[in-house]
From Swiss-Prot:
This is Segregation and condensation protein A. Keywords: Cell cycle, Cell division, Chromosome partition, Cytoplasm. Component of a cohesin-like complex composed of ScpA, ScpB and the Smc homodimer, in which ScpA and ScpB bind to the head domain of Smc. The presence of the three proteins is required for the association of the complex with DNA. Participates in chromosomal partition during cell division. May act via the formation of a condensin-like complex containing Smc and ScpB that pull DNA away from mid-cell into both cell halves. InterPro entries: ScpA (IPR003768), ScpA-like_C (IPR023093). GO terms for cellular component: cytoplasm. GO terms for biological process: cell division; chromosome segregation; DNA replication.
């Protein structure tokens, strides 16, 4: 015999909450008869499979049966001092556990999100400090003060850790190389800017650029540019395989 958690539930409250959500039960008005029956079915199933049911599940089973029996008592047999709903304590614990699960899930998601970020330590800018004498300050006007304020803001921003999100590469250099090769099999030359639209991410533009640099170094293509900032012309190189 061995001990397991029922269907991977983390204790009896987790099992009860699962049943409440599965059968869409109002947590503030629990029908004890049906909920107890569903709960006991889980416990009996484990016993039939000769699985050693943890004692906490059996304690909860006893509590459910007790609450159920109190609700079944005729009204005139109920103790006059018993004013509270016998389900009240159980409902309170279930709500508290439900909140705990929701917060745990939220923290888990935040932890996973944070793992995609790396923090850079502030840059040391102490070497940029400049001592200003009082005589120099006397010549300042409002415009100088505004400029100084903007400079202070910029320096403070540099002292803050810079957080950069690392995005998984979705367009590889290999894909860009194949795209260039396909173009050159149909045309002896073409313009670099025709490879993409300017609505595409900058990462994809950079990937294309790295691809043509690699192809140029290996002699697969030649690249030409008439003037600075003009479009780059991509031409078949001596090692280009037209296939």
């Amino acid at each position: 015999m061995y001990e397991v958690k029922l269907d991977a539930f983390n204790g009896p409250l987790d099992l009860l909450l699962h049943l409440i959500q599965k059968y869409e039960i109002d947590i503030y008005d629990i029908p004890m008869k049906s909920l107890t029956e569903q709960y006991m079915q889980y416990v009996h199933a484990m016993k039939q499979l000769e699985i050693n049911v943890a004692s906490e599940y059996l304690v909860m089973a006893s509590e459910l049966l007790m609450i159920k029996s109190k609700l079944l008592l005729p009204q005139h047999d109920v103790d006059d001092n018993l004013e509270e709903d016998p389900r009240e304590d159980l409902v309170g614990r279930l709500i508290e556990y439900q909140n705990y699960k929701e917060y745990t899930q939220l923290l888990t998601e935040k932890k996973e999100e944070r793992e995609h970020y790396f923090t850079k330590h502030p840059t040391d800018l102490s070497h940029l400090e400049k001592n200003v004498t009082w005589d120099e300050c006397q010549t300042l006007d409002l415009t100088d003060l505004i400029v100084a304020y903007q400079r202070v803001k910029s320096r403070l921003a540099l002292n803050k850790p810079k957080t950069v999100e690392i995005i998984k590469e979705s367009f590889t250099i290999q894909q860009a190389t194949e795209k260039v090769t396909t173009q050159l099999r149909h045309h002896t030359s073409f313009n670099f800017f025709s490879l993409f639209t300017f609505s595409e991410p900058i990462e994809q533009v950079v990937t294309h650029f790295l691809a043509i640099l690699e192809m140029s170094k290996s002699g697969v293509i030649n690249i030409e540019q008439v003037r600075s900032f003009d479009d780059i012309r991509i031409i078949r190189g001596v090692n280009f395989n037209i296939g």
